[in-house]
Each structure stands twice: as C-alpha cells, then as structure tokens.
Amino acid sequence: MKKYLVFILVFLAVSLMLQAEEDIRVDRIDFNSLRDDWMQMEIELSCEGNSKEDARDKDYVEKIKVKAYLGYTRDASARSFDYYTSEIEILIMEKGDDNNVYFYLPGLIVERDQLKTDPDFYYVEVSVNGNAQKPQKAAMSSNIPNLDILNSFISKADSEGADNEHVLMPYYLVSGIDLG
C-alpha cells in the first residue's frame, strides 16, 4: 500500500511540475467585433513565477514580450493569406497575476478586406527575457495541429506580412478612440 501511495504522490508531483513549466501561461484568446467594425483580440495571461535559476526574485517575471500572429484567407483557391502581426512588452508580472493584452484591427481594414471576427489562423508567442517559451495549445487556433504547421505559419507571417505592418495595433496605440 505504501509503494502505491508513494507512486501516486510522485506522479502528482511530476504532473504539477509539467503543468507549470512556463513562466507565463496563455489562458484564453478571444476575438470580438466592436463599434465601427473594429476587431479586438483579447489575450489572457497568467504568471506562474520565475523558473530561472538566477532570478532576482522567483515571484516576479520581467521583460515579457507578447507577439500576436493573425492569418486571414484572402483567396482560398490560390491559398493566399493576409497576415497581421504586432507585439507588446509587459515590464513585470508577479506570480499569481492575471493580465489581459489587447490588439486591434481598424474597422476600415476589416470592412475593406471583409475580414471575419475570428481569423483562420492565429498564434500568440510569449517570450521572457528574449527567450521564446514553448508553444502552448491555448495560444493557437485549432487549425494549427502540430509544430510543423505552426512554424510554417510563423515563417509566412513574418515574410509575407510586410504589406500589413503596423495595421494590427496594440491597445496603447488606439487610446482615445471610442470603440464602445
């Protein structure tokens, strides 16, 4: 009985360690249609604490970059896409903190390109101190089933998204605009 109990405790401890391996967790991503056709991307983040050996304080994570990648089908028969990317930096988060990050597509772009509220593909990359965290399932669309497709999507968004550079905007660039 003791061996069985020890096995269960070890299994639970390993499971908990695997769940908390990333310092910043992407909990949820939502897309919302706003006034005047603006589109909002909401990313909910949680801080799990600093796993770095030489961390100044294990309860604080610093220099967090959040990069959003969106892909909308432009022409299905030609398999062409419009890509939008943008990133922000969060200075610091404390263990247990939840933070929401917002990105926006202007209504005139959404209207002109007839974009749906939810993109065909999306991914949110989180980096801490310049090091990208492992991809998290909650950080990507269900159309991205494996790392090969994810890497291809990121590569294409980076190389083919120049036409839409700065179109997807972080929340601090749309302050003062009444989005309802």
What are these regions, as identified by a protein language model?
Residues 24-34:
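Short amphipathic beta-strand and strand-loop transition segments with alternating hydrophobic
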Residues 56-89, 120-129:
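Extended low-complexity, serine/threonine- and proline-enriched intrinsically disordered segments
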Residues 4-14:
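Sec-dependent N-terminal signal peptides
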Residues 18-20:
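Boundary at the C-terminal end of the N-terminal hydrophobic targeting segment
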Residues 32-54, 59-65, 103:
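Contiguous beta-strand segments within globular domains
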Residues 44-47, 101-115:
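Short, hydrophobic beta-strand segments
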Residues 52-54, 109-121:
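Short glycine/proline/serine/threonine-rich loop/turn segments at secondary-structure transition edges
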Residues 84-94, 107, 123-180:
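Short beta-strand elements
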